[in-house]
Regions:
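Mature-region segments of soluble proteins
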Residues: 2-3, 11-19, 23-26, 30-171
Length: 171
């Protein structure tokens, strides 16, 4: 399970995040799983930093329900949105399965994530499909393929997997 080393995520949010990234990037014969790759750490660091606090977002409103092409239309910082989505996903998972996401079997996780990504699961005011597709998945892919200095892609494992040598450290 998660340790207290996270900067932004609570232990429950970290457990959900680790389960998400491990399901989306499972450990196999090719290498480490998502948590070992540092994807959960990357997500936590992004949410704990300037990005997570909405440093470059206009958050003064008015906030109206828009279309997907209108972009981000919420009065929440990315960190607040991530946490609201975690709470919503946990509540929806408890209602559907009677247990949290990190305790589900792989097939249950897959079915649930497909329903979330497809917009079939709502949790109160949180559109979990929008949350997953516009926040979680981009953070996941960034964490997998970013420069390891940001916490993800440990040992450049994702780069090695796709044959990318990385940038030379020359000055």
């Amino acid at each position: 399970g998660p340790t207290a080393g996270y900067q932004c995520l609570s232990l429950d949010e970290a457990a959900l995040t680790e389960a998400l990234v491990d399901h989306m990037w499972p450990k196999d014969g090719l290498g480490a799983g998502g948590t070992e790759l540092g994807i959960a750490t990357f997500i936590d660091r992004q949410l704990a930093g300037a990005y997570g606090s909405g440093d470059r977002l206009y958050l003064q409103g008015p906030f109206r329900k828009g279309r997907p092409q209108h972009g981000y239309q919420l009065p929440l910082t990315p960190a607040q949105y991530y946490k609201a989505g975690c709470a919503g996903m946990t509540a929806a998972c408890q209602a559907r399965f009677g247990k949290p996401f990190d305790k589900l079997a792989a097939a249950e996780r897959e079915a649930f994530l497909l329903d979330i990504a497809g917009g079939k699961v709502r949790a109160g005011a949180v559109d979990l499909g929008g949350w997953f597709n516009s926040l979680v998945y981009p953070l996941f892919t960034q964490g997998a393929f970013a420069d390891p200095i940001y916490g993800g892609n440990q040992g450049k494992a994702a780069w090695k997997l796709i044959g990318y040598p990385g940038l030379p450290a020359v000055y």
